[in-house]
Amino acid sequence: MTEIYDFDKSAWDIKGSIAPIQPTTYSDGRLVPQVRVIDPGLGDRKDECFMYMFLLGVVEDSDSLGPPIGRAFGSLPLGVGRSTAKPEELLKEATELDIVVRRTAGLNEKLVFYNNTPLTLLTPWRKVLTTGSVFNANQVCNAVNLIPLDTPQRFRVVYMSITRLSDNGYYTVPRRMLEFRSVNAVAFNLLVTLRIDKAIGPGKIIDNTEQLPEATFMVHIGNFRRKKSEVYSADYCKMKIEKMGLVFALGGIGGTSLHIRSTGKMSKTLHAQLGFKKTLCYPLMGINEDLNRLLWRSRCKIVRIQAVLQPSVPQEFRIYDDVIINDDQGLFKVL
């Protein structure tokens, strides 16, 4: 049976929203480059120079004979770097990059990015830019089906999103525990509700924010499990959650990300499941790629976070990540 408890809005009041990137254009219709800086942390890290960089832009034909034809809107996650340069200086260099894009396929459709321009201020991000990178196409492009193979393509940077990593400690993405199941355990999940205000252009105002669309996504935190063959009650789990003193924020890791920090006491078992870290990061790029693409330039705000307590899925239940399931005749095999 599922039990749901609401967190108090004070848990995300300070850092629970992201400002939009409002599109503006030059006289010829080209988008004006912009940079957005997000700080989801509490500011207790001594060195404030670490940041995560995420580029947004247009995938277009690189043929110089005429005006480039835009094919799709895409993104390029550059990862974490350390820099004291101003955001505007980083944006300027990013817009001057010559980034080649190529469509290919592996387990799924991929986009390959590599840069041909020497780096100066963006040197801390050279690992992605100079050695090339491959991403799941649906995670970094809104319409990969429109990208041709017979015409060279480039990625023209238009927007830059910088997330300052100002929290002390590590930003842990607890990937190993996300599929962990246990007998007689209670799964602790979060249901997050966002209110979305898409970037509609300067000077346009929506009078009633209650009419804005909302979207939800769910993340798994961990499991509450007793040593004996008994199950914790929902009320007891709620008490343990309240003692954790969870604080929530929105960041720009991989597009949009949920940041969680425990400011209180965490159970030893759950703390171990989370790698003994109290600062967690859940990028929507890996949780819900469709919602993440929708939020690339939008204003979004947390309006509700709920703790969802559910019985842990039995271990004998198999997880099928493939549409091909083995059959008794051996006609199909998942390798």
From Swiss-Prot:
Keywords: Host cell membrane, Host membrane, Host-virus interaction, Lipid-binding, Membrane, Viral envelope protein, Viral matrix protein, Virion. GO terms for molecular function: lipid binding; structural constituent of virion. Its main location: virion. It comes from the Viruses. GO terms for cellular component: host cell plasma membrane; membrane; viral envelope. Coiled coil: none annotated. It is found in: Virion; Host cell membrane. GO terms for biological process: virion assembly. Pfam families: Matrix_Paramyxo_C, Matrix_Paramyxo_N. Belongs to the morbillivirus/respirovirus/rubulavirus M protein family. Homodimer. Dimerization is critical for virion formation. Interacts with host ANP32B. The M protein has a crucial role in virus assembly and interacts with the RNP complex as well as with the viral membrane. Associates with phosphatidylserine (PS) and phosphatidylinositol 4,5-bisphosphate (PIP2) at the plasma membrane. Interaction with PIP2 triggers matrix protein lattice polymerization. Matrix proteins induce host membrane deformation and curvature necessary for virion assembly/budding. This is Matrix protein. It comes from Measles virus (strain Hu2) (MeV).
